[in-house]
Design a protein with these regions (language model features):
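Structural preference for solvent-exposed beta-strand-turn elements
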Residues: 1-174, 178-198
């Protein structure tokens, strides 16, 4: 994974619906994603979807590096009748909240419950916090597409450069904390958090 805008993604997955969603994710998130994945889809897509989520999460975590200078937080995206909200925090703390009722158990040949499995694998192995809610929608395909669009936009916002991230804060952090208040600036690998420095 690279955060660029000009390259076409290199995606080949033996689950057509998942490949479609990954292409939506890379387009709207402006990600350069290379992924080739094949599995026992003659049984079902469960293992493949979960493994792709794991690999994408790990690649995302590595691409973010120390996360210094990024906005960190990221969105709403419609697809016709469907409107989804995805809020991401590149915090280093894996968590998934997934509230997306699916009207149908299948979208074509794709088991719709696997969307949650993909997101859980992404959150756990990307070490990020994800809150995903469907605000409204009736078409299952549109609902899933709006979720992936929202995820793409949330990631795009969260990885954007933010010059304010390097600014001093009112409270000391990391090695500077407890040093008599002489310095309140963040050091190079520090990410501010309500639970301390990440």
């Amino acid at each position: 994974v690279e955060f660029v805008t000009a390259r076409a993604p290199d995606i080949s997955v033996s689950c057509g619906f998942l490949e479609h969603m990954l292409r939506i994710l890379t387009f709207h998130g402006q990600l350069d994603l290379k992924i080739h994945a094949y599995g026992d889809t003659e049984v079902d897509c469960h293992h493949l979807v979960e493994d792709v989520g794991i690999c994408f999460g790990q690649a995302l975590r590595e691409a973010l590096g120390d996360k210094r200078g990024i906005a960190r937080y990221g969105s709403l995206a419609p697809m016709d009748d469907a409107l989804s909200m995805v809020v991401v925090d590149l915090s280093g703390r894996p968590y998934l909240h997934f509230n997306v009722p699916m009207p149908c158990a299948k979208a074509g040949d794709f088991d719709t419950e696997l969307v949650e499995e993909f997101m859980r694998a992404l959150a756990n192995h990307g070490q990020l916090t994800l809150h995903i809610d469907l605000l409204h929608g009736s078409n299952t395909h549109h609902i899933i597409e709006s979720v992936f669009k929202s995820l793409a936009l949330a990631l795009r916002q969260a990885v954007a450069r933010d010059t304010n991230v390097d600014a001093d804060t009112d409270a000391g952090t990391g090695a500077n904390a407890g040093s008599g208040g002489k310095s309140s600036g963040r050091t190079a690998r520090q990410i501010p958090s309500t639970k301390g420095v990440l």
